[in-house]
């Protein structure tokens, strides 16, 4: 067994440590008897964790055979399965790329989903991949309210904030075509290194700024802090100190290796966000296993002792300790579940590997050109409706104008035709923008749509 093949070592260690009872000690003392958590819920969560782990292990084996093209896994982050259970699938989720367990657990909420097969199609770049058509490995599902995201550099954070902001705005404007309920919240997960990106900082600031002024931004930010961004360590306490006293936020720290603590803290976060309609920041301390991806040789920047110490803190081993201590499962039960999950994943992945790939230009373009359902657009406003909006400017619509004025007219037409369109930003409301591109929109369409 090669010291560089950490996936194989972690796999073998799991079986060995469970058999011998050599399991890591709890980082916090939180007895199951002091909670209302059902043992069956712990078992379900553990199964999702194990399935996610085996998807990672299988992906690396298939890569060696030329059948898999993506090996950034979720190993070490399997505690996020809890978020897939506590938050209903009706809450939209913008997910980090290590969300395998969350995706699998969330799928249990709706019948007819096939999370393992969908992930396998994505791993193998199959044209049948239901969310990206084999173009990119992302977590996504329309049925589960998970818009697909390339989340590596937190580009999804501003989008998540925008959705959270839109929930009550859509209600107040009586927009009928809505995906989310009035009491929905939005989930947005990311890694610890991602919070330093300007896109993320803009999203965090917007959520806090709106909340500070009395607005509602019902969003749960989930920072899955494994302490390292690819090879660069995150400074100690940087995440906590950046958010623990951030205006407008409720900060909740939890142990990402402890299912019991995760469940209790997730319930607290869900209740606070849903009731107060304001941002919550969950700081989930966890670990990363098997490096950043299959191509990452972790021994190039971590000592062997450090790697092995981290591997012994495997969240699956922590879950085993909890299950055995609380007599939810025996060691034999756990090992049987682990091997059964391996067989399931092997079968699903081998089946997915046989599905069609993107072989022609037509295959590549199909997701753009395919007409899968009839689309309808709002009726073009009539002349009287336009005159009511433009007023005295109606007479100038056919005359030559400079670009800023033409953009202004275009925005008025768009907002008249599409009642779900908003314009918001610095100086765009009453002032109408520094160059008057948004002039008069505030008076034409009101402060709920232009702000």
What are these regions (language model features)?
Residues 1-80, 86-87, 290-445:
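Conserved acidic/glycine
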Residues 54-57, 61-219, 229-249:
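Cofactor-binding active-site loop characterized by glycine-rich and histidine/acidic residues
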Residues 69-70, 187-191, 253, 421-427, ...:
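Short glycine-rich or small-residue beta-strand-to-loop segments that form or flank ligand, phosphate
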Residues 79, 100-104, 195-197, 227-231, ...:
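Flexible loop/turn segments at secondary-structure boundaries
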Residues 126, 225-227, 235-237, 286-288, ...:
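Short glycine-enriched loops at secondary-structure junctions
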Residues 171, 178-182, 235-268, 311-340:
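Conserved thiamine diphosphate
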Residues 271-276:
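Long, amphipathic alpha-helical stalk/connector segments used for oligomerization, subunit docking
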């Amino acid at each position: 067994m090669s010291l560089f093949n950490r996936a194989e070592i972690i796999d073998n260690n799991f079986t060995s440590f469970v058999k011998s009872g050599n399991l890591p000690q709890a980082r916090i003392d939180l007895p199951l008897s002091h909670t209302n958590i059902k043992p069956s819920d712990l078992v379900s969560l553990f199964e999702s964790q194990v399935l996610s782990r085996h998807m990672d292990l299988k992906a690396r084996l298939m890569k060696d055979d030329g059948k898999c093209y993506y090996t950034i896994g979720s190993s070490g982050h399997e505690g996020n399965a809890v978020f897939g259970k506590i938050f209903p699938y009706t809450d939209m989720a913008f997910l980090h790329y290590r969300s395998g367990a969350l995706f699998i657990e969330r799928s249990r909420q709706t019948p007819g989903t096939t999370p393992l097969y969908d992930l396998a199609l994505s791993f193998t770049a199959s044209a049948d991949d239901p969310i990206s058509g084999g173009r990119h490995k992302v977590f996504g599902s329309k049925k589960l309210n998970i818009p697909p995201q390339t989340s590596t550099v937190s580009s999804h954070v501003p989008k998540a904030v925008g959705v959270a902001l839109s929930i009550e705005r859509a209600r107040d404007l009586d927009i009928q075509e809505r995906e989310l309920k009035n009491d929905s919240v939005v989930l947005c997960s990311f890694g610890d290194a991602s919070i330093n990106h300007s896109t993320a900082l803009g999203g965090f600031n917007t959520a806090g700024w709106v909340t500070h002024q009395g607005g509602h931004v019902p969003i749960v930010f989930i920072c899955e802090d494994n302490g390292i961004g690819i090879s660069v360590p995150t400074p100690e306490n940087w995440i906590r100190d950046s958010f623990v006293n951030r205006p407008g936020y409720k900060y909740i720290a939890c142990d990402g290796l402890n299912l019991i603590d995760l469940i209790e803290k997730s319930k607290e976060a869900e209740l606070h966000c849903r009731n107060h309609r304001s941002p919550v920041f969950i700081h989930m301390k966890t670990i990363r296993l098997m490096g950043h991806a299959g191509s990452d040789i972790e021994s190039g920047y971590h000592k062997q002792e450090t790697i092995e110490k981290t591997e012994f803190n495997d969240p699956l081993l922590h879950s085993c300790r909890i299950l055995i201590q609380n007599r939810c499962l025996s060691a034999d039960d756990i090992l049987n579940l682990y091997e059964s999950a391996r067989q399931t994943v092997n079968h699903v992945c081998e089946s997915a590997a046989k599905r069609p790939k993107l072989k022609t230009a037509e295959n590549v373009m199909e997701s753009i050109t395919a007409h899968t359902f009839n689309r309808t657009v709002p009726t073009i406003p009539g002349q009287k409706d336009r005159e009511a909006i433009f007023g005295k400017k109606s007479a100038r619509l056919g005359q030559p104008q400079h670009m800023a004025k033409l953009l202004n007219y275009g925005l008025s037409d768009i907002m008249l035709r599409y009642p779900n369109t908003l314009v918001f930003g610095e100086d765009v409301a009453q002032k109408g923008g520094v160059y008057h591109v948004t002039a008069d929109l505030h008076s034409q369409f009101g402060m709920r749509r232009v702000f």
